[in-house]
């Protein structure tokens, strides 16, 4: 055997002996219970680091420019907005932000008003004098025959004059004047475009927790979208072509009032036809309509579609949140019941995980335009497992408003 090979063999034996001695030391001092606890904690930490460094790292490091071009320039687009209430504040503020977008190609905004207020509809039509590219369509409200968002969107898509469609809602406003430009240019690299939607920043801890929850939930589907396994997008900020829409005969799951941004997308999304706009100026900002009760109700309502998600997507979410929860519980067990040096080791593992988590959260926040993330993130990190547990428990009961 050559001298170098002998030296490597001796080094391997030395390392193996040291490892065995260390394991024997742990077993002798902490018993099999302590050894098992240590192994479980290390395994859970490894799972957590894999998700936050590798899986979510794809979001932070994603570059849409690496995807193949299918168009040489941004296309003409139609922005579809369903409207189910007489929100005069929307006409005075958020609609102006939509109409004032800077976009090199022609664009139109199609508002589908579902209601019975003729004065409001007239006000909408009067806006066309100021904005010639505004198209207004009305569906008469009838309490005996409720109109769903999908039905309103279908009318809007048929009314649109352009092939490329962008869907948003009256609850959201663009983060910048370049929102439409960012989304439109993304059509150059895919027939489906996905954008991020933030929650409107406000003062207070509740708003912070809701904002971080939105970012975390979005990270789940963004991580799969950038890895060419799209299963959903933001209902306030996504686009597709008319050809794709009519190619599958429109929206599915018509017995549900939700699903346009996930169940429909699952039918049309392929590995090579999705473009992801991950820049702050391409985001939308959703208005926060309430506190934590509103947010949990929001998760419950749209969580009705969760059962129809691909197994791989559901398993990934549950493994991540499950491993986080178990890691916290095993670490707490170590901190309460184990000797001082074991407690110190558990604390080091907790700190190691948190550093990885907060650094990744900050890098993703930078990509999507979320601000003020890092300093209070430990609060959300502790609270999130409980919030997700409550959301899963609530999903065991059917939300009748999500079904027709």
Please identify what each model-predicted range represents.
Residues 15-71, 361, 388:
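N-terminal membrane-anchoring/stem segments of glycan-assembly enzymes
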Residues 71, 321-400:
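Membrane-embedded multi-pass helical conduit in multi-pass membrane proteins
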Residues 76-78, 108:
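Cell-envelope/extracellular polymer assembly enzymes that use nucleotide-activated donors
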Residues 95-143:
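Acidic donor-binding segment of Leloir-type glycosyltransferases
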Residues 131-138, 143-148, 152, 156, ...:
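Long helical/loop segments within the catalytic core of UDP-sugar-dependent glycosyltransferases
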Residues 165:
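Short aromatic/hydrophobic "clamp" motif used to bind/position activated sugar donors
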Residues 170-185:
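Acidic donor-binding/catalytic loop of UDP-sugar-dependent glycosyltransferases
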Residues 192-217, 246, 252-316:
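Catalytic donor/gating beta->alpha subdomain of glycosyltransferases that bind UDP-sugars
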């Amino acid at each position: 055997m050559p001298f170098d090979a002998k030296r490597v063999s001796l080094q391997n034996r030395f390392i193996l002996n040291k490892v065995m001695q260390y394991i024997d030391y742990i077993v002798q001092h902490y018993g099999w219970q302590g050894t098992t606890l240590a192994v479980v904690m290390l395994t859970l930490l490894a799972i957590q680091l894999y998700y936050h460094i590798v899986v979510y790292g794809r979001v932070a490091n994603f570059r849409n420019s690496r995807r193949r071009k299918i168009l040489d320039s941004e296309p003409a687009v139609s922005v579809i907005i369903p409207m189910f209430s007489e929100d005069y504040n929307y006409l005075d503020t958020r609609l102006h932000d939509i109409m004032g977008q800077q976009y090199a190609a022609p664009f139109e905004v199609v508002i589908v008003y579902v209601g019975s207020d003729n004065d409001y509809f007239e006000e909408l039509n009067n806006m066309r004098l100021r904005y010639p590219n505004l198209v207004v369509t009305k569906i008469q409200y009838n309490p005996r025959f409720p109109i769903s968002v999908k039905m309103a969107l279908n009318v809007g898509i048929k009314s649109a004059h352009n092939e490329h469609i962008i869907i948003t809602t009256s609850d959201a406003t663009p983060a910048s004047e370049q929102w439409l430009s960012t989304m439109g240019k993304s059509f150059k690299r895919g027939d489906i475009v996905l954008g991020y939607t933030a929650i409107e920043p406000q003062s207070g801890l509740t708003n912070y927790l809701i904002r971080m929850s939105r970012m975390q939930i979005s990270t789940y589907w963004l991580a799969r979208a950038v890895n060419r396994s799209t299963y959903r997008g933001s209902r306030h900020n996504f686009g597709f072509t008319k050809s794709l829409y009519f190619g599958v005969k429109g929206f599915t799951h018509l017995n549900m009032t939700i699903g346009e941004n996930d169940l429909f997308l699952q039918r049309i999304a392929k590995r090579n036809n999705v473009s992801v706009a991950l820049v702050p100026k391409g985001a939308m900002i959703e208005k926060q309509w309430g506190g934590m009760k509103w947010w949990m109700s929001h998760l419950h309502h749209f969580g009705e579609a969760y059962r129809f998600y691909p197994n791989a997507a559901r398993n990934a979410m549950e493994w991540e949140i499950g491993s986080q929860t178990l890691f916290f519980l095993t670490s707490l067990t170590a901190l309460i019941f184990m000797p001082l040096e074991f407690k110190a080791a558990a604390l080091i593992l907790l700190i190691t995980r948190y550093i990885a988590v907060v650094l990744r959260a900050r890098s993703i926040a930078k990509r999507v335009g979320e601000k003020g993330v890092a300093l209070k993130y430990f609060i959300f990190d502790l609270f999130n497992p409980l919030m997700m547990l409550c959301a899963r428990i609530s999903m065991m009961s059917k939300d009748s408003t999500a079904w027709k």
